[in-house]
Structure formats: structure tokens, C-alpha cells
């Protein structure tokens, strides 16, 4: 007898009511995509659960992949046995004996299939007695056991587990539409992308690159961050915008204290064009209320004016230390702090407006035509597709 399955439990997906099926189907697709390189592994779903059939594979590498799949609340290595009292006894004893350091245990039986003749409470007592009779130096503790042997009796078979691994929860990536992440290369925006994915959002990303003021290493840093994010979702397209000429024009032609605000508005205009082309429904940013000049309520109000797209700001109420802790936990922090400039850290005004007025911005913009340079910028966009294994180049065509 061996552990031959991984039992997957849903989180808030179980509360989705009539449309739960579409969430479960998407979760199954995402799981299959993450573990497709393991030969013979199969993913099956049943009422309220999903199972991965190991088919001779070691469970640990597969578990490491599954722990980062949004939509999974928890998982357990499981033994599958026939729905007979003797088989269930044997499986429960095997599961308990695998926990060599346990001094106390409890048994929890859940009888999903009422075709099984013994009620759950009675089966609890039968199994508890059997385990006590066939082990040494271990006692029952129903309140704080070292190990809980869980038995799920289903129509097709019984599944027995002896431990639970907490996962990331959330919703399966792809169930909440697609969003364009403004990815700078700093600490905040990758965390914003991660948190958006946790709510089921499928990401594409846009990066504003200003060579020679920003280097090729700065661009590669963004691609590396994107590759880290693919561990938690699907492949991600990154749209790299050649921003130098437009950025220089903004800082040359606009009042210095309003240049940062106008630059952000241009970023949103370009991002909106990509959203239209790629059928993306929203923008996601790493903005955090009150952190820097462009992230005051007044600045957001003025910058938002140029787009009708919803703007998702997952970090809006987090403090910097909280954001740093998440970035460390998800593996983006060390890349984010590499000392390469991005377009938002060059040409920084001495005293940027923290309370920019819409009417002033519109007045300044109306006195200079940025359209030719903006169209040239859009035509020069490069797109790369990032997976968790490779970087694939492709040209960005037909944007206009």
C-alpha cells in the first residue's frame, strides 16, 4: 500500500453557487498545465474535490507546483482504497504509521456516499479502536492531535489522508478576465500582479523602456520578474514600449512640476491602446495611496481622466513593509532591488505636483501635439511572451 493520490480542496470557489462548474473546470486546466511534464499524472474531479493520480511519480515535486496554483485551498497526499471496512482499516493504519513522530491522533470520517452501510460516527469508533489496538505508545486526542487521520468515503472509493498542506487559495487564474499590469521593475508592481492573479486575473504586462537612460539589463530585469510571476499563473505577454523620445518631449515641452503627471497620463493612454488590441478589460498598477507624488488621491484623480478602463490597485491600503514581505515570500524581491534605473526614476522633477489640477493639465496638453510621437512610440512596441521555462520573442503587429 502506498500514497497514490493527491487530494485537492477548494477554498472560496465552493461558495460560487450555480457557476462553480466554470471555476472548477478552469482550475483543472490550470493544474494540468502546471504538472503536464510529469509522465502519467492525471487530474480528475469529483463532487467537492479534485484528485491527482500520481501513477508512480513522487508526490513532493508535484506538490511544490500545486502549492502555487490559485484556487487550491489545501491538499493532502492520499491513499485510495476500496469501500470495505477491512480496506479502510488497513489504509488508516498505514497512514498513521507513516507519521513516525506522532504521539496522539484523532480519526475523522466523512461519509459522502450513503451507499456505504456504516454511519460516520460508528466508523470513527471502529477505526479509532483498530488504530489503538495495532500501534504502540500513541493515544487519542480529539482536541489537539499530533496527526488527524481523515477518511472520505465516496461513491467510487475511499480516500485516506494524514496531513494537510495549506496552499494559496484565491480564484483560478483566468476566471476574472484579463488585465494589463504596468510593470516598472520595482518592488510594488510585481506584488500587485501577484495579488491580481490571486483574484483570478490573467495578466499581460506593459513596460516603459527609455534607452539609453535605462539599460538592457533593466529590461531583462522586468522579463525576469515576469518569469517569476508565471509560477503562479499562465504565460504572460510583456509589451515593451520605447518611451525615450516621448518622455523627453514631455519633460521638454511641459512645465516641470506637471511633467510627471502628464507622463503618467501618456502611459495610461498607450496602455489603453494595447488593452483595445488585446481585448484586455482593465489596468493593474502598483500604486499605493500616499507613497509618492503620483500616488496621492488628487494625482490619481487627474491621471485617471484619460482612460475609461477600470484600474485595479491591489496595494492601495498596504504599507511598504507589508509589500516588501509579500515580494520576499513570492520570490520577486531580490530581482526588484537590482540597481537598474527605470523610466520613472529618470528625469525626476525637483518638486512634482502632489495635487495636480485636471484643468491645468488639460490646458498644458492642449498647447502641444504629442500625437505624432505617441503614434511612433506605439508602432515601435516590442512584445515577448514569457513562460515559466522560456522567453519567446514575437513582434507586436497591427496595433493601430
Curated annotation (Swiss-Prot):
Residue span, THUMP domain: 60-164
Gene3D superfamilies: 3.30.2130.30, HUPs
GO biological process: thiamine biosynthetic process; thiamine diphosphate biosynthetic process; thiazole biosynthetic process; tRNA 4-thiouridine biosynthesis
Biological pathway: Cofactor biosynthesis; thiamine diphosphate biosynthesis
Classification via PROSITE patterns: THUMP
Family matches, as InterPro entries: Rossmann-like_a/b/a_fold, ThiI_AANH, ThiI_fer, ThiI_N, THUMP_dom, THUMP_ThiI, tRNA_STrfase, tRNA_sulfurtransferase_ThiI
Protein location: Cytoplasm
Keywords of this entry: ATP-binding, Cytoplasm, Nucleotide-binding, RNA-binding, Thiamine biosynthesis, Transferase, tRNA-binding
Pfam families named in the record: ThiI (PF02568), ThiI_fer (PF22025), THUMP (PF02926)
Any one GO cellular component localisation term in the record: cytosol
GO MF, one annotated term: ATP binding
EC number(s) from the headed UniProt entry: 2.8.1.4
Catalytic activity: [ThiI sulfur-carrier protein]-S-sulfanyl-L-cysteine + a uridine in tRNA + 2 reduced [2Fe-2S]-[ferredoxin] + ATP + H(+) = [ThiI sulfur-carrier protein]-L-cysteine + a 4-thiouridine in tRNA + 2 oxidized [2Fe-2S]-[ferredoxin] + AMP + diphosphate; [ThiS sulfur-carrier protein]-C-terminal Gly-Gly-AMP + S-sulfanyl-L-cysteinyl-[cysteine desulfurase] + AH2 = [ThiS sulfur-carrier protein]-C-terminal-Gly-aminoethanethioate + L-cysteinyl-[cysteine desulfurase] + A + AMP + 2 H(+)
Binding site residues for ATP: 182-183, 207-208, 264, 286, 295
Major subcellular site: cytoplasm
Domain of life according to the entry: Bacteria
Similarity remark: Belongs to the ThiI family.
Function text: Catalyzes the ATP-dependent transfer of a sulfur to tRNA to produce 4-thiouridine in position 8 of tRNAs, which functions as a near-UV photosensor. Also catalyzes the transfer of sulfur to the sulfur carrier protein ThiS, forming ThiS-thiocarboxylate. This is a step in the synthesis of thiazole, in the thiamine biosynthesis pathway. The sulfur is donated as persulfide by IscS.
Name recorded for this polypeptide: Probable tRNA sulfurtransferase
Gene from which this protein is expressed: thiI
